[in-house]
Protein backbone atom coordinates (compact mmCIF):
# COMPACT_ATOMS: atom_id res chain seq x y z
CA UNK A 1 0.00 0.00 0.00
CA UNK A 2 1.42 3.34 -0.99
CA UNK A 3 2.05 5.90 1.72
CA UNK A 4 2.12 9.61 1.10
CA UNK A 5 3.71 12.36 3.10
CA UNK A 6 1.24 14.78 4.68
CA UNK A 7 2.65 18.00 6.03
CA UNK A 8 1.54 18.96 9.53
CA UNK A 9 -0.17 22.32 9.91
CA UNK A 10 2.21 25.11 10.75
CA UNK A 11 0.85 25.91 14.21
CA UNK A 12 3.35 28.70 14.89
CA UNK A 13 2.27 30.48 11.70
CA UNK A 14 -1.39 30.00 12.58
CA UNK A 15 -0.86 31.42 16.07
CA UNK A 16 1.05 34.43 14.81
CA UNK A 17 -1.58 35.36 12.23
CA UNK A 18 -4.05 38.18 12.89
CA UNK A 19 -7.74 37.70 12.19
CA UNK A 20 -10.78 39.95 11.95
CA UNK A 21 -13.68 38.15 13.64
CA UNK A 22 -17.35 38.87 14.41
CA UNK A 23 -18.31 38.15 18.03
CA UNK A 24 -21.74 36.54 18.37
CA UNK A 25 -22.20 35.97 22.10
CA UNK A 26 -20.53 35.58 25.51
CA UNK A 27 -19.74 32.25 27.12
CA UNK A 28 -20.68 31.56 30.77
CA UNK A 29 -17.26 32.82 31.88
CA UNK A 30 -17.72 36.18 30.14
CA UNK A 31 -15.44 35.60 27.14
CA UNK A 32 -16.54 36.64 23.66
CA UNK A 33 -17.34 33.83 21.21
CA UNK A 34 -16.46 34.02 17.52
CA UNK A 35 -15.93 31.36 14.83
CA UNK A 36 -13.00 30.63 12.52
CA UNK A 37 -12.29 27.58 10.35
CA UNK A 38 -15.27 25.76 11.81
CA UNK A 39 -14.10 26.20 15.39
CA UNK A 40 -15.15 28.38 18.31
CA UNK A 41 -12.70 31.13 19.23
CA UNK A 42 -12.83 32.45 22.81
CA UNK A 43 -11.74 36.10 23.16
CA UNK A 44 -11.48 37.71 26.58
CA UNK A 45 -12.65 41.32 26.57
CA UNK A 46 -14.73 41.07 23.38
CA UNK A 47 -18.49 41.66 23.38
CA UNK A 48 -21.39 40.44 21.21
CA UNK A 49 -21.97 42.36 17.96
CA UNK A 50 -18.38 43.55 17.88
CA UNK A 51 -15.90 43.02 15.06
CA UNK A 52 -12.45 42.60 16.56
CA UNK A 53 -8.87 42.09 15.48
CA UNK A 54 -7.50 38.99 17.19
CA UNK A 55 -4.24 37.09 17.42
CA UNK A 56 -4.68 33.37 18.09
CA UNK A 57 -2.84 32.26 21.23
CA UNK A 58 -4.00 28.67 21.56
CA UNK A 59 -5.21 26.04 19.10
CA UNK A 60 -7.13 22.94 20.19
CA UNK A 61 -9.01 20.36 18.17
CA UNK A 62 -12.43 21.86 18.87
CA UNK A 63 -11.67 25.45 19.87
CA UNK A 64 -9.11 28.24 19.84
CA UNK A 65 -8.29 31.18 22.07
CA UNK A 66 -7.42 34.62 20.85
CA UNK A 67 -5.95 37.82 22.25
CA UNK A 68 -7.97 40.96 21.61
CA UNK A 69 -5.80 43.42 19.67
CA UNK A 70 -8.27 46.03 18.47
CA UNK A 71 -12.01 46.70 18.43
CA UNK A 72 -12.92 47.42 14.83
CA UNK A 73 -16.66 47.79 15.45
CA UNK A 74 -17.75 48.68 18.99
CA UNK A 75 -20.81 47.27 20.79
CA UNK A 76 -23.40 49.80 21.95
CA UNK A 77 -23.31 47.98 25.31
CA UNK A 78 -19.58 48.56 25.83
CA UNK A 79 -18.69 51.04 28.59
CA UNK A 80 -15.40 52.42 29.88
CA UNK A 81 -14.31 50.56 33.05
CA UNK A 82 -13.90 53.08 35.89
CA UNK A 83 -11.35 50.97 37.76
CA UNK A 84 -7.70 51.84 36.92
CA UNK A 85 -6.71 48.23 37.67
CA UNK A 86 -9.29 46.58 35.39
CA UNK A 87 -6.89 45.40 32.68
CA UNK A 88 -4.54 43.76 35.21
CA UNK A 89 -6.55 42.68 38.26
CA UNK A 90 -8.21 39.27 38.07
CA UNK A 91 -11.25 40.30 40.10
CA UNK A 92 -13.78 42.06 37.85
CA UNK A 93 -13.97 40.72 34.29
CA UNK A 94 -17.16 42.41 33.02
CA UNK A 95 -16.64 46.07 33.89
CA UNK A 96 -16.54 46.82 30.15
CA UNK A 97 -20.18 45.66 29.75
CA UNK A 98 -23.18 47.82 30.72
CA UNK A 99 -24.71 46.59 33.99
CA UNK A 100 -28.14 45.84 32.54
CA UNK A 101 -26.49 43.88 29.73
CA UNK A 102 -24.47 41.99 32.35
CA UNK A 103 -27.64 40.94 34.15
CA UNK A 104 -29.39 39.96 30.93
CA UNK A 105 -26.39 37.83 29.94
CA UNK A 106 -26.27 36.11 33.33
CA UNK A 107 -30.01 35.41 33.36
CA UNK A 108 -29.81 33.91 29.86
CA UNK A 109 -26.75 31.84 30.84
CA UNK A 110 -28.61 30.42 33.83
CA UNK A 111 -31.73 29.45 31.90
CA UNK A 112 -29.78 28.09 28.91
CA UNK A 113 -27.60 25.81 31.06
CA UNK A 114 -30.55 24.38 32.98
CA UNK A 115 -32.59 23.91 29.80
CA UNK A 116 -29.68 22.20 28.04
CA UNK A 117 -28.39 19.83 30.72
CA UNK A 118 -31.50 19.18 32.81
CA UNK A 119 -33.66 19.27 29.68
CA UNK A 120 -36.47 21.15 31.37
CA UNK A 121 -37.92 24.64 31.49
CA UNK A 122 -39.09 26.44 34.61
CA UNK A 123 -42.77 27.31 34.85
CA UNK A 124 -41.69 30.83 35.82
CA UNK A 125 -38.47 32.78 35.27
CA UNK A 126 -38.38 35.39 38.02
CA UNK A 127 -37.03 38.93 37.86
CA UNK A 128 -33.38 39.17 38.97
CA UNK A 129 -32.53 40.16 42.53
CA UNK A 130 -29.98 42.96 42.34
CA UNK A 131 -28.53 45.92 44.21
CA UNK A 132 -25.81 48.52 43.74
CA UNK A 133 -23.42 47.89 40.86
CA UNK A 134 -20.42 49.39 42.69
CA UNK A 135 -18.94 49.30 46.21
CA UNK A 136 -21.19 46.41 47.21
CA UNK A 137 -18.64 44.01 48.73
CA UNK A 138 -18.60 43.99 52.52
CA UNK A 139 -15.70 41.54 52.59
CA UNK A 140 -12.58 40.91 50.53
CA UNK A 141 -9.30 39.05 50.89
CA UNK A 142 -6.22 40.87 49.61
CA UNK A 143 -3.00 39.07 48.76
CA UNK A 144 0.49 40.19 49.77
CA UNK A 145 3.84 39.67 48.07
CA UNK A 146 7.23 40.40 49.63
CA UNK A 147 10.01 41.41 47.25
CA UNK A 148 13.28 40.07 48.65
CA UNK A 149 15.32 42.59 46.67
CA UNK A 150 13.47 45.82 47.44
CA UNK A 151 12.05 44.63 50.81
CA UNK A 152 8.72 46.08 49.67
CA UNK A 153 5.46 44.30 50.37
CA UNK A 154 2.73 44.65 47.75
CA UNK A 155 -0.95 44.58 48.71
CA UNK A 156 -3.63 43.82 46.14
CA UNK A 157 -5.44 41.10 44.20
CA UNK A 158 -4.15 38.24 42.08
CA UNK A 159 -3.81 38.83 38.37
CA UNK A 160 -6.09 36.81 36.10
CA UNK A 161 -4.94 33.16 35.84
CA UNK A 162 -1.77 34.01 37.76
CA UNK A 163 -0.27 34.05 41.24
CA UNK A 164 1.18 37.53 40.62
CA UNK A 165 -0.13 40.26 42.92
CA UNK A 166 -1.50 43.40 41.28
CA UNK A 167 -0.83 46.26 43.70
CA UNK A 168 -3.94 48.43 44.04
CA UNK A 169 -4.80 51.79 45.58
CA UNK A 170 -8.57 51.28 45.61
CA UNK A 171 -11.28 48.80 44.66
CA UNK A 172 -14.41 49.86 42.78
CA UNK A 173 -16.56 47.00 44.11
CA UNK A 174 -15.34 47.02 47.72
CA UNK A 175 -17.37 48.97 50.30
CA UNK A 176 -16.07 52.54 50.19
CA UNK A 177 -14.78 52.67 53.80
CA UNK A 178 -12.76 49.50 53.15
CA UNK A 179 -11.48 50.69 49.77
CA UNK A 180 -10.34 53.96 51.36
CA UNK A 181 -8.22 52.00 53.87
CA UNK A 182 -6.03 50.33 51.25
CA UNK A 183 -3.34 53.02 50.62
CA UNK A 184 -2.73 53.75 54.32
CA UNK A 185 -2.87 50.06 55.16
CA UNK A 186 -0.28 49.22 52.50
CA UNK A 187 1.99 52.03 53.74
CA UNK A 188 1.68 50.88 57.36
CA UNK A 189 2.40 47.23 56.53
CA UNK A 190 5.63 48.31 54.86
CA UNK A 191 6.74 49.93 58.15
CA UNK A 192 6.55 46.64 60.05
CA UNK A 193 9.83 44.88 60.79
CA UNK A 194 8.03 41.53 60.50
CA UNK A 195 6.34 42.28 57.17
CA UNK A 196 7.95 39.20 55.62
CA UNK A 197 5.71 37.09 57.86
CA UNK A 198 2.49 38.62 56.52
CA UNK A 199 0.10 36.51 54.45
CA UNK A 200 -3.26 37.61 53.14
CA UNK A 201 -5.27 40.52 54.55
CA UNK A 202 -9.02 40.22 55.06
CA UNK A 203 -11.15 43.38 55.15
CA UNK A 204 -14.71 43.17 56.49
CA UNK A 205 -17.46 45.74 56.93
CA UNK A 206 -19.77 44.42 59.65
CA UNK A 207 -22.79 46.08 61.23
CA UNK A 208 -20.67 46.83 64.30
CA UNK A 209 -17.63 48.27 62.53
CA UNK A 210 -14.80 47.56 60.12
CA UNK A 211 -12.40 44.68 60.75
CA UNK A 212 -8.88 44.02 59.43
CA UNK A 213 -7.54 40.49 59.82
CA UNK A 214 -3.83 39.96 59.12
CA UNK A 215 -2.67 36.42 58.45
CA UNK A 216 0.79 35.97 60.01
CA UNK A 217 3.21 33.05 59.82
CA UNK A 218 5.32 34.25 62.76
CA UNK A 219 4.66 36.16 65.96
CA UNK A 220 5.02 39.90 65.43
CA UNK A 221 7.11 42.03 67.76
CA UNK A 222 5.51 44.26 70.38
CA UNK A 223 6.70 47.27 68.38
CA UNK A 224 4.92 46.02 65.26
CA UNK A 225 1.76 45.33 67.27
CA UNK A 226 1.90 48.86 68.65
CA UNK A 227 2.05 50.23 65.09
CA UNK A 228 -1.00 48.17 64.18
CA UNK A 229 -2.92 49.42 67.21
CA UNK A 230 -2.02 53.00 66.29
CA UNK A 231 -3.36 52.36 62.77
CA UNK A 232 -6.53 50.79 64.20
CA UNK A 233 -7.23 53.73 66.47
CA UNK A 234 -6.55 56.30 63.74
CA UNK A 235 -8.88 54.62 61.24
CA UNK A 236 -11.44 53.34 63.77
CA UNK A 237 -11.07 49.70 62.79
CA UNK A 238 -10.57 46.50 64.77
CA UNK A 239 -7.35 44.63 63.93
CA UNK A 240 -6.84 40.91 64.49
CA UNK A 241 -3.84 38.67 63.89
CA UNK A 242 -4.59 35.16 62.62
CA UNK A 243 -1.96 32.42 63.01
CA UNK A 244 -1.36 29.13 61.19
CA UNK A 245 -3.97 27.40 63.36
CA UNK A 246 -6.60 30.02 62.42
CA UNK A 247 -6.57 31.33 65.99
CA UNK A 248 -7.14 35.08 66.23
CA UNK A 249 -5.60 37.64 68.55
CA UNK A 250 -7.47 40.93 68.98
CA UNK A 251 -5.06 43.86 69.10
CA UNK A 252 -7.95 46.16 70.01
CA UNK A 253 -11.73 45.95 70.29
CA UNK A 254 -11.74 43.80 73.46
CA UNK A 255 -12.59 40.57 71.62
CA UNK A 256 -15.52 42.06 69.71
CA UNK A 257 -16.92 39.71 67.05
CA UNK A 258 -18.32 41.01 63.74
CA UNK A 259 -22.00 40.49 63.01
CA UNK A 260 -24.73 41.38 60.54
CA UNK A 261 -28.45 41.62 61.19
CA UNK A 262 -31.30 40.59 58.91
CA UNK A 263 -33.84 43.37 58.57
CA UNK A 264 -37.43 42.82 59.59
CA UNK A 265 -36.47 40.46 62.42
CA UNK A 266 -34.41 40.20 65.60
CA UNK A 267 -31.98 37.84 63.91
CA UNK A 268 -28.31 38.72 64.36
CA UNK A 269 -25.58 36.53 62.90
CA UNK A 270 -22.12 36.69 64.43
CA UNK A 271 -19.24 35.34 62.36
CA UNK A 272 -15.49 34.78 62.60
CA UNK A 273 -12.75 35.38 60.01
CA UNK A 274 -12.90 31.75 58.89
CA UNK A 275 -16.69 31.67 58.52
CA UNK A 276 -18.35 32.05 55.13
CA UNK A 277 -20.76 34.96 54.64
CA UNK A 278 -22.32 36.40 51.50
CA UNK A 279 -20.29 39.45 50.47
CA UNK A 280 -23.25 41.48 49.20
CA UNK A 281 -25.36 42.44 52.22
CA UNK A 282 -28.46 43.98 50.58
CA UNK A 283 -28.69 41.25 47.93
CA UNK A 284 -28.23 38.59 50.61
CA UNK A 285 -31.17 40.12 52.49
CA UNK A 286 -33.32 39.98 49.34
CA UNK A 287 -32.20 36.40 48.67
CA UNK A 288 -33.09 35.21 52.18
CA UNK A 289 -36.48 36.94 52.00
CA UNK A 290 -37.25 35.28 48.65
CA UNK A 291 -36.25 31.83 49.92
CA UNK A 292 -38.52 32.20 52.96
CA UNK A 293 -41.36 33.43 50.74
CA UNK A 294 -40.97 30.52 48.31
CA UNK A 295 -40.92 27.88 51.06
CA UNK A 296 -43.42 29.63 53.40
CA UNK A 297 -42.51 27.45 56.42
CA UNK A 298 -45.28 27.14 59.00
CA UNK A 299 -45.47 26.07 62.63
CA UNK A 300 -45.55 22.28 62.82
CA UNK A 301 -43.56 21.78 59.60
CA UNK A 302 -40.09 20.23 59.51
CA UNK A 303 -37.55 22.05 57.31
CA UNK A 304 -34.06 20.83 56.40
CA UNK A 305 -31.29 23.30 55.50
CA UNK A 306 -28.20 21.65 53.99
CA UNK A 307 -24.86 23.52 53.82
CA UNK A 308 -26.40 25.89 56.38
CA UNK A 309 -23.23 27.78 57.34
CA UNK A 310 -23.78 30.09 60.32
CA UNK A 311 -27.57 30.04 59.93
CA UNK A 312 -28.12 32.61 57.17
CA UNK A 313 -31.24 30.77 55.96
CA UNK A 314 -31.92 28.45 58.92
CA UNK A 315 -32.77 31.16 61.43
CA UNK A 316 -35.20 33.12 59.20
CA UNK A 317 -36.88 29.83 58.24
CA UNK A 318 -37.44 29.09 61.95
CA UNK A 319 -38.80 32.47 63.05
CA UNK A 320 -42.47 31.57 62.42
CA UNK A 321 -42.38 28.37 64.45
CA UNK A 322 -41.23 25.71 61.99
CA UNK A 323 -38.79 23.07 63.22
CA UNK A 324 -35.55 23.61 61.30
CA UNK A 325 -32.59 21.24 61.03
CA UNK A 326 -29.39 22.84 59.76
CA UNK A 327 -26.51 20.67 58.55
CA UNK A 328 -23.02 21.96 57.78
CA UNK A 329 -19.65 20.39 56.94
CA UNK A 330 -17.47 22.88 58.86
CA UNK A 331 -17.48 22.31 62.64
CA UNK A 332 -16.69 25.94 63.52
CA UNK A 333 -19.69 27.19 61.55
CA UNK A 334 -21.99 24.63 63.20
CA UNK A 335 -20.89 25.93 66.59
CA UNK A 336 -21.39 29.54 65.48
CA UNK A 337 -24.85 28.74 64.10
CA UNK A 338 -25.88 27.33 67.49
CA UNK A 339 -24.70 30.52 69.21
CA UNK A 340 -26.57 32.64 66.66
CA UNK A 341 -29.79 30.68 67.19
CA UNK A 342 -29.57 31.06 70.96
CA UNK A 343 -28.89 34.81 70.88
CA UNK A 344 -31.78 35.27 68.43
CA UNK A 345 -34.16 33.44 70.79
CA UNK A 346 -34.94 30.59 68.37
CA UNK A 347 -35.34 27.25 70.16
CA UNK A 348 -36.87 25.15 67.37
CA UNK A 349 -33.71 24.99 65.28
CA UNK A 350 -30.97 22.38 65.68
CA UNK A 351 -27.60 22.20 63.95
CA UNK A 352 -25.56 19.13 63.02
CA UNK A 353 -22.12 18.51 61.57
CA UNK A 354 -21.86 16.10 58.62
CA UNK A 355 -19.79 15.47 55.52
CA UNK A 356 -22.41 16.25 52.89
CA UNK A 357 -20.31 14.69 50.13
CA UNK A 358 -20.44 11.27 51.84
CA UNK A 359 -23.12 8.63 52.44
CA UNK A 360 -25.85 10.24 54.55
CA UNK A 361 -28.02 7.17 55.10
CA UNK A 362 -27.04 6.73 58.77
CA UNK A 363 -27.21 10.37 59.84
CA UNK A 364 -29.54 10.90 62.86
CA UNK A 365 -31.24 13.89 61.26
CA UNK A 366 -32.05 12.08 58.01
CA UNK A 367 -35.77 11.46 57.71
CA UNK A 368 -38.93 12.80 56.16
CA UNK A 369 -39.15 16.57 56.00
CA UNK A 370 -41.85 18.89 54.72
CA UNK A 371 -39.57 21.38 53.02
CA UNK A 372 -35.91 21.73 52.22
CA UNK A 373 -33.30 24.35 51.31
CA UNK A 374 -29.84 23.66 49.95
CA UNK A 375 -27.03 26.19 49.44
CA UNK A 376 -23.88 24.27 48.41
CA UNK A 377 -20.47 25.48 47.31
CA UNK A 378 -19.49 25.62 43.63
CA UNK A 379 -19.14 21.83 43.41
CA UNK A 380 -22.87 21.48 43.97
CA UNK A 381 -24.70 18.79 45.93
CA UNK A 382 -24.84 15.72 43.73
CA UNK A 383 -24.31 13.28 46.62
CA UNK A 384 -26.86 14.97 48.89
CA UNK A 385 -29.51 14.90 46.18
CA UNK A 386 -29.38 11.09 46.20
CA UNK A 387 -31.17 11.22 49.59
CA UNK A 388 -34.27 12.98 48.27
CA UNK A 389 -36.28 9.74 48.09
CA UNK A 390 -35.89 9.30 51.84
CA UNK A 391 -36.44 12.95 52.71
CA UNK A 392 -39.42 13.48 50.39
CA UNK A 393 -39.82 17.25 50.85
CA UNK A 394 -42.82 18.62 49.01
CA UNK A 395 -40.83 21.76 48.16
CA UNK A 396 -37.10 22.29 47.65
CA UNK A 397 -35.27 25.60 47.21
CA UNK A 398 -31.82 25.24 45.64
CA UNK A 399 -29.51 28.27 46.01
CA UNK A 400 -26.52 27.98 43.69
CA UNK A 401 -23.32 29.91 43.00
CA UNK A 402 -22.51 27.77 39.94
CA UNK A 403 -25.11 27.36 37.18
CA UNK A 404 -23.27 24.34 35.78
CA UNK A 405 -23.58 22.32 39.01
CA UNK A 406 -27.19 23.50 39.43
CA UNK A 407 -27.98 22.20 35.95
CA UNK A 408 -26.36 18.84 36.75
CA UNK A 409 -28.10 18.48 40.12
CA UNK A 410 -31.44 19.56 38.62
CA UNK A 411 -31.37 16.47 36.44
CA UNK A 412 -31.11 14.28 39.57
CA UNK A 413 -33.91 16.18 41.31
CA UNK A 414 -36.26 15.94 38.33
CA UNK A 415 -35.72 12.19 38.03
CA UNK A 416 -37.05 11.80 41.57
CA UNK A 417 -40.45 13.20 40.67
CA UNK A 418 -39.95 16.93 41.10
CA UNK A 419 -40.93 19.78 38.78
CA UNK A 420 -39.00 23.02 38.29
CA UNK A 421 -41.51 25.73 39.21
CA UNK A 422 -39.36 28.86 39.49
CA UNK A 423 -35.85 29.98 38.70
CA UNK A 424 -34.18 33.36 38.92
CA UNK A 425 -30.86 35.19 38.84
CA UNK A 426 -29.37 36.67 42.01
CA UNK A 427 -26.79 39.27 40.95
CA UNK A 428 -24.54 38.89 43.98
CA UNK A 429 -21.36 39.85 42.11
CA UNK A 430 -21.86 42.76 39.65
CA UNK A 431 -18.97 43.51 37.27
CA UNK A 432 -17.98 39.81 37.24
CA UNK A 433 -19.22 36.78 35.31
CA UNK A 434 -20.08 35.02 38.59
CA UNK A 435 -23.76 34.54 39.29
CA UNK A 436 -25.91 33.29 42.13
CA UNK A 437 -29.30 31.78 41.43
CA UNK A 438 -32.33 30.27 43.12
CA UNK A 439 -34.60 27.50 41.91
CA UNK A 440 -37.83 26.12 43.38
CA UNK A 441 -38.71 22.46 42.85
CA UNK A 442 -42.03 20.95 43.91
CA UNK A 443 -42.92 17.28 44.20
CA UNK A 444 -45.29 16.24 41.42
CA UNK A 445 -48.61 14.48 41.93
UniProtKB/Swiss-Prot annotation:
Gene3D superfamilies: 2.40.50.1070, Nucleic acid-binding proteins, Vaccinia Virus protein VP39. Its EC number is 2.1.1.190. It comes from the Bacteria. It is an enzyme of class 2 (transferase). CDD domains: AdoMet_MTases. The keyword Transferase applies. Pfam families: TRAM (PF01938), tRNA_U5-meth_tr (PF05958). The active site is at residue 401. [4Fe-4S] cluster binds at residues 83, 89, 92, 171. The keyword Methyltransferase applies. Keywords: 4Fe-4S, Iron, Iron-sulfur, Metal-binding, Methyltransferase, rRNA processing, S-adenosyl-L-methionine, Transferase. SUPFAM superfamilies: Nucleic acid-binding proteins, S-adenosyl-L-methionine-dependent methyltransferases. GO terms for molecular function: 4 iron, 4 sulfur cluster binding; iron ion binding; RNA binding; rRNA (uridine-C5-)-methyltransferase activity. Signal peptide: none annotated. GO terms for biological process: rRNA base methylation. Belongs to the class I-like SAM-binding methyltransferase superfamily. RNA M5U methyltransferase family. RlmD subfamily. This is 23S rRNA (uracil(1939)-C(5))-methyltransferase RlmD.
